[in-house]
Amino acid sequence: MEELQGYLEIDRSRQQHFLYPLLFQEYIYALAHDHGLNGSIFYEPMENFGYDNKSSSLIVKRLITRMHQQNHLILSVNDSNESIFVGHNKNFYFQMVSEGFAVIMEIPFSLRLVSSLEEKEIAKSHNSRSIHSIFPFFEDKLSHLNHVSDILIPHPIHLEILVQTLHCWIQDAPSLHLLRFFLHEYRNSNSLITPKKSISLFSKENQRFFLLLYNSHVYECESVLVFLRKQSSHLRSTSSGTFLERTHFYGKIEHLVVVLRNDFQKTLWLFKDPFMHYVRYQGKSILASKGTHLLMKKWKSHLVHFWQCHFYLWSLPDRIHINQLYNHFLYFLGYLSSVRLNTSVVRIQMLENSFLIDTSINKFETLVPIIPLIGSVAKAKFCNVSGHPISKSVRADSSDSDIINRFGRIYRNLSHYHSGSSKKQTLYRIKYILRLSCARTLARKHKSTVRAFLKRLGSEFLEEFLTEEEQVLSLIFQRTSSPSYRSHRERIWYLDIIRINDLANHS
């Protein structure tokens, strides 16, 4: 039990006590502007809120002045419904404060990361943050395993649980009170809490702020997996060192907040499995094992009980699915992954005798699902639900080259993300949709026909939709008889992709 106590201890020397005053510093909002995620408030057009870019610094100074006033950051018990963000710019001010608040709250986790890397002498590699690095790991590990569990991590049902989760990391009471105020204020005035009381995390506004809260919640949910995995393994497990999303905390620190101590050692043997692997991206995780179906059911039961006891979450049975790898497609990060048994016959000639040997190899395959991808493209209004390309409305002052570059960039980014597909037919279908949608958009702008417009542009229009992968592969396989066939089946994984493509995110 002494080792268990080590997991329950919190390193208080690194907890921050003076984060709240940083909220009144102008450079914090500059950091939020420079390092914010795409889609945050600072990357939205300022004219949408009635301001231009030149006055953004003035807005921050005005906001800090308002916060210095005594009544603006104090939540009164008697006037709990009164908002500090009065006026028609309430949402805008709230989003600015939440962006700066997220930058401040990330400071303790950044310090933990630096300290963890120094103690373990781990080089900080940006390549390990790529979500594409998961698939080579799958290819190396999953082909030798038997069962896989698709897990949807439940959302926090109560706001106070989110605050208490961060309380374990941060001892700055004013910051925690402000966080509690933010959550209740936004719940009362917006759609933070849905009718089912689940958190709306990945909205375009306040994305960094909600990612911080969500990542802390997910870390607590999976902490029990890290602890049990280390206890059950015959060899000492190695921390991954990084998370996958950009604003994750990048350090999987091995400690357990709450563990049932009764009959602990007696229960632990039920989960012993030296071939257990766990990966996660956002709210979906995968638990793969070489063990039996019974072992996976025990893991499922343990996770459900842990979430119920620790987070007061009632996890539905359909949030954890257990399947065999050999007859199941694993949907993860916009790919359909599977393990297929490939058989081949090898003829061996030895002097006067010859032998035929049957060999079977487990091959990991990744495919792009066509129906969900077309649904995402249709949702972005490039085509209808049947996949028929349609024109998009554009600004009258947009040049033809800008429109073509925009459509070409969308396809290149999508093709770049799905470059690991074993079959490229789905991407060619998407290329056709985007190319024809672009042509229809330009023809609509010039009040012409698509045929006449394509005839006028010629090959220059087609080159905009030629990806770097196709150019490189055409050079590599230019001496072979069928370079197109080779390029159709070549899988390429990139180590610079740190977030899922918006069109590939079908959830």
UniProtKB/Swiss-Prot annotation:
A GO CC term attached to the entry: chloroplast
Any Pfam family matching the protein: MatK_N
Transmembrane intervals: none
Subcellular location: Plastid, Chloroplast
GO MF terms held by the record: RNA binding
Entry coiled-coil feature ranges: none
InterPro entries documented for this protein: Domain_X, Maturase_MatK, Maturase_MatK_N
Keywords associated with the record: Chloroplast, mRNA processing, Plastid, RNA-binding, tRNA processing
GO biological process per UniProt: mRNA processing; RNA splicing; tRNA processing
Function recorded in the entry: Usually encoded in the trnK tRNA gene intron. Probably assists in splicing its own and other chloroplast group II introns.
Family: Belongs to the intron maturase 2 family. MatK subfamily.
Protein name: Maturase K
Organism, scientific name: Magnolia champaca (Yellow jade orchid tree)
Underlying gene: matK
